[in-house]
């Protein structure tokens, strides 16, 4: 019985994706089940002078149970919500085994494809039934019909600046103790190329060359499975457990549906992709604050991607943090953090220029300071700008370079750099 229920859900999903619409045959059920989902159950029936028929009590019980199941699917797997409610009548929710359904199917990778005009159909029902301002409904609409394209960044391409060998002191200042500990026990930290006393190769930063798009921070970590579960609570439990070093194997191929590296859908849930590793997306906002610390959390909040997600009512999860776990190296994972760069107009309004003349092989031609923001411009026309509280180690690199090549470097400018860096 359960198997037939599951198959019916995926048959409806396949039909919707094939037609890119909701067939007329489902419209009555769609309206009834949207009302059940987005209106609160009425509570116990009030006593009446005449005895109520048993079917009234049964109907109320079924709708209350269905409300809980529908809402849980909506919260965890919004892309599956419409096919699920169309294939699962309220009566079936009484015996529906949601835990078993999660375990047997990779629900996080499901995507429904609806034409934009279907939004009018849903909005008409919402307006008529009075739940058009319901927070869950608005978030569903933003998930299914995101406004505008998700902001891209050239930091994810080859056309970017890449900085490696971060200063350890700055890493401990910027990241939480939990993240620093995960770096220290990662395989990368013990590799021959990562044995410098003051720097680490576990941190890499990529910045766009010629624009103000988001920056990317790459971290080589060895995160405990419990931490990954906290960051990605919607990830399939079976897949998470299979990534444990004790399991000795990676997830089965059948669990992988999404294309690796795709970033074109709003994330209200974790997406797991398979290539050389397994990519988890849709991190919990509250977990990011506790796991990464307030500085990284603040930088994520200022990113263009996070602002776009908020505009689309993605308030609890974000694609700004993803983790790629390497099944052949279960102790090693690459964490990708997308952070804010700088507002273009704000940068142009408030800048103080200090000229530098350095005789390095790839000399820095200009250092730009602006309160808590600084930029480095090379001899090439491109320049990079980033927030000081995220890139302390780059500021240290500039100072060290200036000290090594002090000829022609204004002494007052060097003192200014050192003073601002202490802030």
From Swiss-Prot:
Residues 243-273 are annotated as: Disordered. A motif (Bipartite nuclear localization signal) lies at residues 46-69. Its main location: nucleus. The keyword Disulfide bond does not apply. Residues 243-257 have a biased composition (Polar residues). It comes from the Eukaryota. The keyword Nucleus applies. It is found in: Nucleus. GO terms for cellular component: nucleus. Residues 157-187 are annotated as: RNA recognition motif (RRM)-like domain. Belongs to the hrmA family. Probably modulates the generation of the hypoxia-typic morphotype (called H-MORPH) with altered biofilm architecture that leads to increased host inflammation, rapid disease progression, and mortality in a murine model of invasive aspergillosis. This is Hypoxia responsive morphology factor B. The lineage of its organism: Eukaryota, Fungi, Dikarya, Ascomycota, Pezizomycotina. The gene is hrmB.
């Amino acid at each position: 019985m359960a198997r037939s229920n599951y198959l019916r859900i995926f048959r409806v999903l396949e039909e919707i994706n094939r037609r890119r619409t909701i067939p007329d045959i489902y419209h009555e059920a769609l309206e009834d089940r949207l009302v059940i989902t987005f209106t609160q159950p009425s509570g116990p029936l009030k006593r009446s002078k005449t005895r109520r028929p048993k079917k009234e009590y049964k109907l109320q019980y079924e709708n209350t149970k269905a409300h809980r199941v529908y809402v849980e699917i909506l919260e965890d797997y919004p892309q599956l919500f419409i096919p699920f409610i169309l294939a699962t009548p309220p009566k079936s929710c009484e015996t529906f085994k949601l835990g078993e359904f999660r375990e047997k199917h990779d629900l996080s990778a499901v995507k429904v494809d609806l034409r934009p005009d279907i939004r009018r159909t849903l909005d008409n029902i919402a307006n008529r039934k009075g739940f058009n301002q319901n927070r869950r409904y608005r978030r569903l609409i933003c998930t299914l019909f995101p406004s505008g394209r998700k902001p891209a960044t050239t930091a994810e391409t080859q056309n970017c600046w890449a900085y490696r060998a971060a200063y350890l002191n700055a890493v401990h200042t910027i990241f939480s103790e939990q993240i620093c500990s995960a770096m220290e026990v990662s395989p990368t930290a013990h590799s021959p190329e990562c044995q410098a006393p003051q720097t680490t190769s576990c941190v890499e930063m990529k910045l766009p060359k010629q624009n103000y798009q988001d920056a990317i921070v790459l971290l080589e970590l060895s995160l405990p499975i419990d931490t990954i579960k906290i960051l990605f609570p919607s990830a399939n439990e079976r897949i998470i457990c299979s990534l444990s070093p004790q399991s000795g194997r990676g997830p089965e191929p059948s669990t992988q549906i999404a294309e690796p590296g795709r970033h074109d859908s709003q994330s209200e849930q974790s997406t797991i992709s398979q290539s050389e590793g397994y990519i988890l997306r849709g991190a919990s906002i509250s977990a990011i604050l506790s796991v990464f610390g307030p500085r990284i959390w603040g930088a994520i909040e200022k990113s263009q991607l996070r602002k776009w997600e908020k505009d689309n009512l993605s308030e609890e999860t974000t694609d700004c943090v993803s983790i790629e776990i390497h099944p052949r190296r279960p102790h090693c994972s690459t964490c990708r953090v997308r952070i804010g760069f700088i507002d273009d107009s704000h940068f142009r309004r408030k800048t103080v220029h200090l000229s530098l003349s350095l005789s390095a092989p790839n000399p820095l031609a200009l250092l730009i300071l602006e309160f808590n923001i600084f930029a480095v411009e090379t001899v090439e026309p491109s320049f990079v700008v980033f927030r000081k509280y995220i890139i302390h180690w780059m500021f240290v690199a500039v100072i060290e370079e200036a000290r090594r090549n002090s000829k022609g470097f204004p002494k007052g400018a060097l003192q200014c750099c050192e003073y601002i860096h202490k802030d």
